Amino acid sequence: MFGEIYLCRFPFTDSSGSKIRPVIALFDLGQDAVICRVTGRLRSGRMDVMINEWKTAGLLKPSVAMLDRIITAEKSLFISKLGSLASSDLEAVKLRWNQNMVL
């Protein structure tokens, strides 16, 4: 499941609702998954990873994985699978995660 991209009902940070958007599965937890948000707004924060192979991943436009927007979600919130990250993008996500999650 790691690196698969889904359309998902992703909640707003203020819990006022949700928006259907692409997400990347980071961890499979059985009925749940840890996911991060994907945005088409190109940004370059310390927790952002540019998805270089965005067409291969099933995305409609250049996109960024936002590793600072992570939640645990029920898989029932997944609407459809869009694709999977290319191996180079998977490695970039792992590297950025490891660089920023050192305790």
Where are these regions (language model features)?
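Compact nucleic-acid interaction/catalytic patches
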Residues: 14-19, 25-55
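C-terminal terminal-subdomain/extension
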Residues: 56-103
